[in-house]
């Protein structure tokens, strides 16, 4: 085999290796119910993005500067988080590394869940729950005040295909993907998984607070 042929095979091999490695570097997230996103987050706020700019956030292990996008925000309401209002949100500079793009100018309101960084700052990724406020159902908006918190000790298990089962009484089976082929179905929009007095968990529908009779039921 000639040198040119060997070089061509080597180049093709490197291209194949690159194509196999690249997906591992892309942003990949597992779907979560809005209640799970609320419970997993350090901070959950309703806010508008006022401005954005690229900033340095230290250096990597090779000494290269780490770039992040800084959003200056106007917080409208905090549903979960520190006593101090959030003033700045940080994210990666590209969606390929899970960076989030927000509309700036202060017109579009978002529900934003993410990780606290202290001193009025938080960090968000595409794996966090960030949606336009006006896309939330009335039930979701009301559940942010208290109901989601009532079920943070429960486990929401996503059903990817039938059959699927719960393995313990403190689980709620999330069926939206099976029934509607969507992760933003009826259970996401209108239900919360609530812990009851016997320690079990069950789906509760509606915007009104759960009645004592629901909390006291022993069998889901």
From Swiss-Prot:
One of its GO terms (cellular component) is cell surface. It comes from the Eukaryota. Induction: After intracranial injury, expression peaks at 4 days post-injury and slightly declines at 7 days post-injury. Disulfide bonds join 27-98, 29-127, 39-152, 154-201, 159-164, 172-193. Detected in testis, retina, hippocampus and cerebral cortex. One of its GO terms (molecular function) is zinc ion binding. Zn(2+) binds at residue 27. It holds the Pfam family TIMP. PANTHER family: METALLOPROTEASE INHIBITOR (PTHR11844), METALLOPROTEINASE INHIBITOR 2 (PTHR11844:SF24). Interacts (via the C-terminal) with MMP2 (via the C-terminal PEX domain); the interaction inhibits the MMP2 activity. Belongs to the protease inhibitor I35 (TIMP) family. This is Metalloproteinase inhibitor 2.
